[in-house]
Amino acid sequence: MQNSPLTADCSLNAGRPLTIGLVAGETSGDILGAGLIRALKVQVPNARFVGVAGPLMQAEGCEAWYEMEELAVMGVVEVLERLPRLLKIRKDLTQRFSELSPDVFVGIDAPDFNITLEGRLKQRGIRTIHYVSPSVWAWRQKRVFKIGKATDMVLAFLPFEKAFYDRFNVPCRFIGHTMADAMPLVPDQQAARAELGIAPNATCLALLPGSRHSEVEMLSADFLRTAVILRDKLPNLEVVVPLVNSKRREQFERIKAEIAPDLSVHLLDGKARVAMIASDAALLASGTAALECMLAKCPMVVGYRMKPFTFWLAERLVKTPYVSLPNLLAGEELVTELLQQECQPQKLAGALLPLLQGGSEIAALKERFLVLHQSIRCGADEQAAQAVLELADR
């Protein structure tokens, strides 16, 4: 009887333990890599993991040829400054993985670095997986052909990503989203409010103007003006503002002192998820925060503005009808998106007010959020591990 992938013997014909090559390039990839390693060790306790790893992956037993920070470079200038070093690392990894010949190589996110590496290893007969699809479904869609040549399998968080790859006959497995696994289906709003010092009967609005300097600079003033308008209509309104680090907090405080010095807000160091769960509605920049807000069952409005030329370019490059993940998942506009010239305080406040006032429509919206949550809550770590074992013929 042939072993199933999850009960396979843990040694190769040559007697070598299952060997998995991994490259993670940033903190989010380190989290995914650690979860994958944990899930694989449940099935194959003596498996070996080696490559580029952060502290979480190393704590799970991954041997690091290079530290993850070597690849964690942001910004055009920084990338150009580090390019010779990055190219040298990629050349060395190509050589070392070719000599090691792991059963499977898994490139975790970092597509600009990993997809080329995956392609070189695949040419040498090594099976390759790219974990976390780049946003090829949204823009630069021709990248799908390079990904198809470089990988034996793409692991996708979202079902519409798999549907996109299927159109191009690129093997892709929908595994669900790790964030959906981590968040409860029914969040405890009162516990979140107690943690933040928000009264149980207060009306609470979360402002999340983004994590990048440019986003906070571009959005904070209009978000604050929106909160002032809403505070005039809802005197008991509490406003919470989670900020990712001290730099963004200082930046936001500077803008608030100029725009809305008399507006009382709860500034939070991190705690975005708690703030979303505690709030009746959120005003946020697009991105992963919108998905997290949906999983927190918090109604939201997405407001986003960028420099005019950047927006002009994005309009021509982006191929999707929506920018926020809740709408992309639903295939319809569940969440109001006010972009560029539409991102004005009066319009933002007008969209948020009915969300803050509650009612039957809000209950129906939260039910839709719950259904979408369930649709992507699939045990992503275990699904990813099974994909690796199947590709390794285990």
Curated annotation (Swiss-Prot):
Give the record's keywords alphabetically: Glycosyltransferase, Lipid A biosynthesis, Lipid biosynthesis, Lipid metabolism, Transferase
Task: Give the enzyme class.
Answer: transferase
Q: Per its record, what are the GO molecular function terms?
A: lipid-A-disaccharide synthase activity; phospholipid binding
Known catalysed reaction(s)? 2-N,3-O-bis[(3R)-3-hydroxytetradecanoyl]-alpha-D-glucosaminyl 1-phosphate + UDP-2-N,3-O-bis[(3R)-3-hydroxytetradecanoyl]-alpha-D-glucosamine = lipid A disaccharide (E. coli) + UDP + H(+); a lipid X + a UDP-2-N,3-O-bis[(3R)-3-hydroxyacyl]-alpha-D-glucosamine = a lipid A disaccharide + UDP + H(+)
Q: In which pathway does it act?
A: Glycolipid biosynthesis; lipid IV(A) biosynthesis; lipid IV(A) from (3R)-3-hydroxytetradecanoyl-[acyl-carrier-protein] and UDP-N-acetyl-alpha-D-glucosamine: step 5/6
- Keyword Lipid metabolism among record annotations: yes
**Chain coiled-coil ranges:** none
GO annotation, cellular component aspect: membrane
**Which residue windows are transmembrane per the record?**
none
Report any one BP term from Gene Ontology.
lipid A biosynthetic process
UniProt cross-references to Pfam families, sorted A to Z: LpxB
Q: Any idea of its EC number?
A: 2.4.1.182
Q: Does the keyword Lipid biosynthesis apply?
A: yes
**Entry similarity comment:** Belongs to the LpxB family.
Q: What does this protein do?
A: Condensation of UDP-2,3-diacylglucosamine and 2,3-diacylglucosamine-1-phosphate to form lipid A disaccharide, a precursor of lipid A, a phosphorylated glycolipid that anchors the lipopolysaccharide to the outer membrane of the cell.
Protein's name in the database: Lipid-A-disaccharide synthase
- Give the organism's phylogenetic lineage: Bacteria, Pseudomonadati, Pseudomonadota, Gammaproteobacteria, Enterobacterales
Q: Which gene name belongs to this protein?
A: lpxB
